[in-house]
Amino acid sequence: PAFDRWAQNIGELRSTTPTVLFGWCGWMLVILPLLLGLRFRRDRVTVGLVFLALIVATAGLTLHHARWGYFVALFCAMAVPWALAAQRRRWLAWMVFVVSLWPVAREWDHALYPTDAAWRARAENVADAVALRDAAIRLRRLPEGGVMAPWWFCPAIVWWSGQSCIGGSSHQSLPGIVDSCEFYLSESLEKTDAILTSHQIRYVFAYEPARMISNSAQILGRQPISTPLAEPLFRHPKSSSARLESIYANRYFKVLGVRAGQGL
């Protein structure tokens, strides 16, 4: 159950829609099977049938999991010359091809000229990334130890700090992801102490609590308590526990050290 709930946060594991597929492949996604079928009927070219089967299969898989989108786009691009050859009038084939790219052009237009809301979201993501790097590199010269952090930040923290993290963005990190969610949602110091000890955690990252609490609650499938640990760790890091010491803080992140031989 935890895997299914966690997978909802991973873009490539989500289902997609025909509109998204058209943004990747254009309207050729609909036209190609028709042209490939026509080409096979007229010339008996089996390659067209192979492309037809691959496009239909990968398009269906992409509707289930977006990670298959790379393949459907690749097969569509490879099949275009074979499919357009079914139309003997080249000018018509080219016109169909160019017009079919309209959804792709619209997608690029949205990417290059985002709305105000999309632009603000991008700016926030960039600011998050800069602040995370600034916080993570502070651990480079510190003693080696495990890092407790929101799971989606763990790969970047490992890269910039050289320290090991409890979680990651892979399903193989799921046990650590679940434990990190338990940690940030918990109010039981005994339980968090057990998590820190079992993973040999030496450093704790605190981040904007609303996102951490909502994501942890979603993955664990339960409602958070009134004041989860994520809240005091970020709002009042120095007073959240006598066993924690402040190492570094910026606008978005707080880095706390677990005193040697102690948990929370």
What is each stretch, according to the model?
Residues 29-39, 52-64, 72-90:
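Transmembrane alpha-helices and membrane-interface helical segments
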Residues 45-47, 55-59, 246, 252:
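Helicase P-loop NTPase motor core of nucleic-acid translocases
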Residues 24-28, 50, 74, 91-95, ...:
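Alpha-helical transmembrane segments
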Residues 102-264:
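Extracytoplasmic
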Residues 44, 51-52, 63, 127-131:
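Short secondary-structure boundary/capping elements
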Residues 1-41, 45-52:
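Alpha-helical transmembrane segments at the extracellular/periplasmic loop-to-helix junctions
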Residues 78, 84-111:
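Signature aromatic-anchored transmembrane alpha helix within multi-pass, membrane-resident enzymes
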